[in-house]
Swiss-Prot record:
This is Oxygen-dependent coproporphyrinogen-III oxidase. One of its GO terms (cellular component) is cytoplasm. One of its GO terms (biological process) is protoporphyrinogen IX biosynthetic process. The gene is hemF. The active site is at residue 107. It comes from the Bacteria. The lineage of its organism: Bacteria, Pseudomonadati, Pseudomonadota, Gammaproteobacteria, Pseudomonadales. Coiled coil: none annotated. It catalyses: coproporphyrinogen III + O2 + 2 H(+) = protoporphyrinogen IX + 2 CO2 + 2 H2O. Its EC number is 1.3.3.3. A divalent metal cation binds at residues 97, 107, 146, 176.
Length: 305
């Protein structure tokens, strides 16, 4: 697996570079600061953070490559046969929180796991996806986001996008709120249904599609005027983001349980957030429309070319 792991690592480092360059160019003011780190138990990474920009209030694009003698519980709980195997985990994970409430928060992740044991075949899989969390949503943006996701999946089978779109809707669901985190996109894990080269090609297609999915939305919305009321609603909705990441997110749990770097793991949290007791938007308002129309696990491409 050594050559394969090296190829995945080369791609992920290049992907991090390309995404950071594209986001810096779009912001036009802020620059990513890099923090290279090492994990005492094995491995390390490159954390890149950005903030206080013309567009991005807070964001991060992280690369990590960690390894150890046994998988943490979050990774082996649904695959107990992997308990006791040594592992390597590589990935790029990013979250972008724009200041303007009309520009959605975006998240993307592509990752590779390999679990090995002497005398046995290695077990490997890929995971990843991308999802969008709007505050003042636009149907045009939702359709675009999902169209790019569908087109990235298309060369790998007509059933791939619907299956991973539904998985995304199911995964990014706040059970205690009974509502989605956002308007979804793609999510998949344990991907080894094809040969390695095909799975790796799929991961590259998804990683490369993120900028094509996100930047046109940013460009359409970043100059939309906003007021303090809309910023307050954004902070309220960001609370849902925090709740999901700290309670349900498998990547967060894996990082914390495997002795990962806390600052990098919690990089995904927004800079300002608020909770109000039993707060509800005014009926018929833009804020109410978010949950009533957009956060409903819709088929955004129904009737679309």
């Amino acid at each position: 697996m050594t050559d394969r792991i090296a190829a995945v690592k080369t791609y992920l480092l290049d992907l991090q570079d390309r995404i950071c360059a594209a986001l810096e160019a779009e912001d036009g003011k802020a620059r990513f600061a890099e923090d290279a780190w090492e994990r005492p138990a094995g491995g390390g990474g490159r954390t890149r953070v950005i903030g206080d920009g013309a567009l991005i209030e807070k964001g991060g694009v992280n690369f990590s490559h960690v390894f150890g003698d046994s998988l943490p519980p979050s990774a082996s709980a649904h695959r107990p046969e992997l308990a006791g195997r040594g592992f390597q985990a590589l990935g790029v994970s990013l979250v972008i929180h724009p200041e303007n409430p009309h520009v959605p928060t975006s998240h993307a992740n592509v990752r590779f796991f390999c679990a090995e044991k002497a005398g046995e075949e290695p077990v490997w899989w890929f995971g990843g996806g991308f999802d969008l969390t709007p505050y003042y949503a636009s149907e045009e943006d939702c359709v675009h986001w999902h169209r790019v996701a569908r087109d990235a999946c298309a060369p790998f089978g007509a059933d791939v996008y619907p299956r991973y779109k539904e998985w995304c809707d199911r995964y990014f669901h706040l059970k205690h709120r009974n509502e989605p985190r956002g308007i979804g996109g793609l999510f998949f894990d344990d991907l080894n249904q094809w040969d390695f080269d095909t799975c790796f090609a799929f991961i590259r297609a998804i990683g490369d599609a993120y900028i094509d999915a996100y930047l046109p939305i940013v460009q359409r919305r970043k100059h939309t005027p906003f007021d303090e009321r809309q910023r307050e609603f954004q902070a309220y909705r960001r609370g849902r983001y925090v709740e999901f990441n700290l309670v349900f997110d498998r990547g967060t749990l894996f990082g914390l349980q495997s002795g990962g770097r806390t600052e990098s793991i919690l990089m995904s949290l927004p800079p300002q957030v608020r909770w109000g007791y039993d707060w509800k938007p005014e009926p018929g308002s833009e804020e109410a429309r978010l949950t009533e129309y957009f956060l409903t696990d819709r088929d955004w491409l129904a009737g679309q070319p």
